[in-house]
């Protein structure tokens, strides 16, 4: 099968923002008809949208927040497992101020909750925030995007925390390496060692 890819994104979303009740035909439930080989789930734990609010419209906190993210993550895993799809749950790098994602421990628990090898947890910390510490910039190779004179920015300037070109590249490479190590993707299909990135 082939697909037409439309670039659509929203800022600050939670997992529940991507269900059909909130996104209509863009909901994750519609992926089932494609029977994807793999789901990669990566949410840092945002809780500012209406689907993450309590009955009074206030953002969920504490146990209610954790319970909601746990239930929503379970739902995504169940959607994937209906078609025998694999699921890689990705913990985001540590944020500015050394804040950890709100989903890391939930994601870490999923392979135990769903034994059988179709559900895996992966942390991007070693690639972007070694030792659990926020890193703004790092030494780099000329073949990596965003590398200027042997150094590149991993994250946006303060106060933002999103990934710059070098950070996004290392994030993606770390995930691909994990997929290859799991045997879920053929290494030859993703080999970019002979390509110089812009």
Located regions from the model:
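Conserved SGNH/GDSL esterase-like catalytic core that processes O-acyl groups on lipids
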Residues: 1-63
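Active-site segments of SGNH/GDSL-like serine hydrolases
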Residues: 42-48, 76-107
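Second-shell loop/turn segments in exported
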Residues: 15-16, 59-67, 77, 91-98, ...
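Catalytic His-Asp segment of secreted/periplasmic serine-dependent ester chemistry enzymes
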Residues: 94-198
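Structural recognition of the beta-strand scaffold that forms the well-ordered cores
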Residues: 5-9, 37-43, 85-91, 120-123, ...
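Residue-level preference for short coil/turn positions at secondary-structure junctions
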Residues: 34-35, 83, 156
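Short, well-ordered coil/turn elements that cap or connect secondary structure elements
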Residues: 1-2, 82, 113-116
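Extracytoplasmic/secreted proteins, especially bacterial periplasmic and envelope-associated proteins
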Residues: 26, 34, 38, 64, ...
């Amino acid at each position: 099968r082939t697909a037409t890819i439309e670039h659509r994104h929203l800022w600050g979303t939670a997992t529940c923002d991507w269900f059909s009740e909130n996104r209509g035909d863009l909901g994750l439930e519609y992926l089932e008809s494609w029977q994807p080989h793999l789901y990669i789930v990566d949410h840092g734990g945002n809780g500012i949208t209406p689907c993450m609010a309590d009955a009074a419209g206030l953002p969920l906190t504490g146990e209610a927040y954790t319970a909601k993210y746990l239930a929503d993550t379970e739902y995504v895993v169940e959607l994937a497992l209906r078609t025998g799809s694999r699921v890689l749950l990705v913990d985001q790098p540590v944020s500015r101020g050394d804040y950890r994602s709100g989903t890391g421990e939930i994601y870490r628990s999923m392979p135990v909750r769903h034994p059988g090898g179709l559900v895996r947890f992966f942390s991007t910390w070693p690639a972007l925030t070694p030792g659990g510490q926020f890193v703004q910039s790092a030494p780099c190779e000329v073949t990596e995007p965003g590398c200027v004179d042997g150094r590149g920015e991993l994250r946006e300037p303060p106060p933002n925390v999103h990934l710059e070109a070098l950070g996004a590249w290392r994030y993606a490479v770390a995930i691909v390496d994990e997929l290859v190590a799991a045997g879920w993707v053929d290494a030859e299909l993703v080999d970019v060692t002979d390509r110089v990135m812009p």
